Structures are given as structure tokens and as C-alpha cells.
Amino acid sequence: MLTRQATEADIPAIMEIERTEGFEAYVGRSERAQHEALMAAADCHYVMLEDEVGLAGFAILQGVGAASGLLYLKRIAIRSPGKGLGKRFLGELIRLSFEEFGAEKFWLDAFETNQRARYVYASCGLQHDGVLREHYPLADGTRANLVVMSILKREWLTAEAQRQSQLAAQADARDPKLPEFMDAALADIASDISEKDR
């Protein structure tokens, strides 16, 4: 998985992903001029996701460098959901927000009906903050509820420290120390070799 900052050359691919069949109920859509304006904004950062096949997804972050320390994930979309890339991508976006952009809070909103995305967000440590009722106008004239979720920098740092500790413990388990009797046996072998060399 590789991430990079987007350029205007990526806009057609971004719009294609936004308009993937079945995404209309879960992913917002913007016209080219809107994407160009967002890319030009000082507080906005587009992130592209690539895998071994090519472009796999994108995200739009807003509030970069804001004095409030609030960084908003305006949009995230994966070309082929269900392969685990979304969770890994979100984890990288959260890390980027706190470590590189200096945010104090990372937040987003999601369609209340998008259970899969909300599950992924929760699995990355985001907590439920509330519901914006009938907040987003849909193409069919109805309005959708949005669920607000967030994670604080201190919460992420605590979770990251625990994750690193678990990884270290797993590494130790895969590479255990040699038992004392094996150490002794190896020492005897080394001694025999040394004797023969004399």
C-alpha cells in the first residue's frame, strides 16, 4: 500500500471512483471545478491510495494547519471495498493527521445507513459523537442522517503505544531465547571446533 498527495491529473480518477455504481448512497460526489478549488485551498490535502494494481482509493482532509487543531475527513473512498484496504488507509490518514499535520482531533461524518464504514471507523478507535439529523441532501430529494465520529490525539497515542507493545511481544514470541542447555551445547561445540583448529 502506497499513499501520495494528489494532483489535478488525478481528478478524473477521483471522480470515477466517486461515481462507482452502488456508491451513491455512501460516497459524496463533486464536480471537477469543486475538486480543483479544494485542491487549491491551503487547509485541504488530497491523499491518493495505490496498491500493486494501481489507483485504489482517495481521501480528502480539511482543516490542515487549522489553529483549532480539528482535522476533518471530508471524504474517503476505496475502489474495491471488502479487501481490508480501507482500514489500513484510514489508519494511515489518522497517523498523518496527528504526526505530520499536528492535529489534536480527527473527525468525520458518515451516512447513518453505512454500517460497514462505521464498523471500520470504530475498529480504528473513532468514537460516536452524535447524529446530524437529515443533514445531507440526496439526489432523490430526500435527506440523510449523518453520524459524527472522532478520535483525539491522546487517545490515538495511547492506542498506538499499546499496538507497538503487542507487536514487540509477538516478535519475542516468534524468536524465543535459546534454553540454557542449548546455550551450553553450543558452547561445547564451539570449544571442540576451537580444539581442532589448534
Identify the residue ranges that each predicted region occupies.
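Conserved GNAT acetyl-CoA-binding A-motif
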Residues: 99-109
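Extreme N-terminal starter segment of soluble prokaryotic enzymes
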Residues: 1-2
